[in-house]
């Protein structure tokens, strides 16, 4: 078995992680560390968390054998961990419940969050509505356009959504603004970070809350694999998309000790890995400090963070969780890239072969699984973390596919990142909706 105990007591994953924050936030971070240490294994806290996952979220989420896709692709059997079936439509709710429970116990009546694809914002707004907490969500204005259905969902749930106009107007900038808010309102505000990044203890804490995904898979997979005629009791490979990396770490972490299972993170290659328009921090970045932790960062020779690109708002981020950086360096996980076009093709393919509409983020993982399956035997298996559903992306996909659809952003005079470079696939039909 692979020996693995990370992070160390100071929150370091090898040379990565740590806590690089202003003096104003030092007390808040120390307070959070103490609270998490107190409640992490507290029986009442754990029981409440498990109750919420079962009765509010609807866990466990099922594992589905995508048998038609497996037959058509040839090679390995492909299984999907259906996080898209969770309440709010993605894996994000697993983490927001745990952090909101901490906020209540710490006496913080106000919650802030950042969001890219909008799923973390929706999940935060949802649990704040349930617990009666004030909720403010920061979102890059570019992502507000791309993910307008989720913006309205947040408003319905009582959250205030603040569009961020600085920088590239995407996830990085939303996180910057949320950090500024936290500094200004540290006494009464709890910051629910949505990914496995940020200062310690966030990378560890978010990973722990999300690891329910992989823990369920360890129980579910033996029966699924046996029924499919596979040769092992656990998958040969686990594949997940990586932006900040919370869904990937949630499914990877329980499998780290299983050396026979490959862990493969899929980054957004955008317009191509050599185009300069991508979000592949682990493959094209270098070690640096971003948003309170040391990790791989897309930066220029002067250490300035560079702009990123992806059709998926949730992957459009110039950094990555420090544990992913560590797993890459020690060789326990592999990281690959999928382009906008490959992800868009996988989105349409999964819709039409399995009747599942995936998020554009998840489509990157599906696209790589389709490639990988062809190199494997039929008695081998790939487990894909289908991290979210694609309802939020319908308008964007319509623009990217040049389809005639009534709620395309371009119909509202808005442009979508990547639309000028997207071409419809050969078997793609134009969808016309009656007006």
From Swiss-Prot:
Organism: Albidiferax ferrireducens (strain ATCC BAA-621 / DSM 15236 / T118) (Rhodoferax ferrireducens)
Pfam annotation, one family: PALP
First-level EC class: lyase
Family membership: Belongs to the TrpB family.
Name recorded for this polypeptide: Tryptophan synthase beta chain
Single GO molecular function: tryptophan synthase activity
Positions where N6-(pyridoxal phosphate)lysine occurs in the chain: 92
Enzyme Commission number: 4.2.1.20
InterPro entries cross-referenced by the UniProt entry: Trp_synth_b_CS, Trp_synth_beta, Trp_synth_beta/beta-like, TrpB-like_PALP, TrpB-like_PALP_sf
Catalytic activity entry: (1S,2R)-1-C-(indol-3-yl)glycerol 3-phosphate + L-serine = D-glyceraldehyde 3-phosphate + L-tryptophan + H2O
Subunit structure: Tetramer of two alpha and two beta chains.
A cellular component term, taken from the record's GO annotations: cytoplasm
Gene3D superfamilies named among the record's database cross-references: 3.40.50.1100
Role description: The beta subunit is responsible for the synthesis of L-tryptophan from indole and L-serine.
Cofactor: pyridoxal 5'-phosphate
Keyword line: Amino-acid biosynthesis, Aromatic amino acid biosynthesis, Lyase, Pyridoxal phosphate, Tryptophan biosynthesis
Pathway annotation from the record: Amino-acid biosynthesis; L-tryptophan biosynthesis; L-tryptophan from chorismate: step 5/5
């Amino acid at each position: 078995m692979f020996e693995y105990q990370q992070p160390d007591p100071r929150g370091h994953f090898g040379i990565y992680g740590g806590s690089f924050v202003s003096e104003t936030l030092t007390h808040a971070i120390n307070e959070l560390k103490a609270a998490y240490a107190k409640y992490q294994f507290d029986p009442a806290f754990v029981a409440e968390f498990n109750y919420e996952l079962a009765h509010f979220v609807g866990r466990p989420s099922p594992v589905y054998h995508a048998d038609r896709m497996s037959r058509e692709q040839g090679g390995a059997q492909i299984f999907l961990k259906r996080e898209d079936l969770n309440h709010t439509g993605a894996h994000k709710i697993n983490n927001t419940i745990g952090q909101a429970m901490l906020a209540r116990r710490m006496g913080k009546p106000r919650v802030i969050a950042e969001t890219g694809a909008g799923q973390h914002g929706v999940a935060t707004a949802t649990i704040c509505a349930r617990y009666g907490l004030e909720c403010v969500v920061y979102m890059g204005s570019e992502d507000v356009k791309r993910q307008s259905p989720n913006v309205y969902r947040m408003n319905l749930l009582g959250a205030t959504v603040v569009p961020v106009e600085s920088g590239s107007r995407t996830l990085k900038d939303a996180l910057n603004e949320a950090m500024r808010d936290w500094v200004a309102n540290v006494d009464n505000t709890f910051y629910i970070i949505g990914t496995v990044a940020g200062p310690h203890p966030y990378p560890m804490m978010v990973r722990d809350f999300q690891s329910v995904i992989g823990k369920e898979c360890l129980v579910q997979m033996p029966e699924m694999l046996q029924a499919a005629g596979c040769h092992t009791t656990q998958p040969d490979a686990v594949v997940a998309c990586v932006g900040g990396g919370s869904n990937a770490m949630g499914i990877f972490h329980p499998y780290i000790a299983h050396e026979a299972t490959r862990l493969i993170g899929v980054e957004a290659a955008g317009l191509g890995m050599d185009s300069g328009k991508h979000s592949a921090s682990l493959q094209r970045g270098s070690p640096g400090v971003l948003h309170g932790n040391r990790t791989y960062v897309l930066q220029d020779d002067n250490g300035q963070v560079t702009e990123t690109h992806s059709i998926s708002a949730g992957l459009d981020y110039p950094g990555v969780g420090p544990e992913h950086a560590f797993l890459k360096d020690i060789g326990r996980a592999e990281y690959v890239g999928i382009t906008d076009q490959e992800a868009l093709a996988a989105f349409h393919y999964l819709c039409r072969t399995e009747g599942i509409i995936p998020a554009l983020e998840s489509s990157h993982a599906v696209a790589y699984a389709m490639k990988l399956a062809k190199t494997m035997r039929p008695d081998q298996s790939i487990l894909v973390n289908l991290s979210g559903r694609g309802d939020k992306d319908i308008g964007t996909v319509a623009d990217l596919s040049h389809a005639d659809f009534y709620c395309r952003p371009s119909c509202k005079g808005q442009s979508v990142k990547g639309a000028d470079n997207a071409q419809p696939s050969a078997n793609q039909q134009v969808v016309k909706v009656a007006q």
